[in-house]
């Protein structure tokens, strides 16, 4: 028997998405990283595909700008 998971609402659905997802907003970006520093997948975060792409870009930019670490030890 196949079990279907219930659709989740995006965590950032009610907020202004474009304003909040930014490489300078380090506190928000850290919520979407594991303890090892890996980016959490969409099925865990509950973001839409567009939001996840923006989040990934922002995290990668923050890493390049040295606002986030590449590896957490």
Curated annotation (Swiss-Prot):
Keywords: Chloroplast, Plastid, Ribonucleoprotein, Ribosomal protein, RNA-binding, rRNA-binding. The keyword Ribosomal protein applies. InterPro entries: Ribosomal_bS18, Ribosomal_bS18_CS, Ribosomal_bS18_sf. It is found in: Plastid, Chloroplast. GO terms for molecular function: small ribosomal subunit rRNA binding; structural constituent of ribosome. GO terms for cellular component: chloroplast; mitochondrial small ribosomal subunit. The keyword Ribonucleoprotein applies. One of its GO terms (biological process) is translation. HAMAP family: Ribosomal_bS18 (MF_00270). Belongs to the bacterial ribosomal protein bS18 family. Part of the 30S ribosomal subunit. PANTHER family: 30S RIBOSOMAL PROTEIN S18 (PTHR13479), SMALL RIBOSOMAL SUBUNIT PROTEIN BS18M (PTHR13479:SF40). This is Small ribosomal subunit protein bS18c. It comes from Nephroselmis olivacea. The lineage of its organism: Eukaryota, Viridiplantae, Chlorophyta, Nephroselmidophyceae, Nephroselmidales. The gene is rps18.
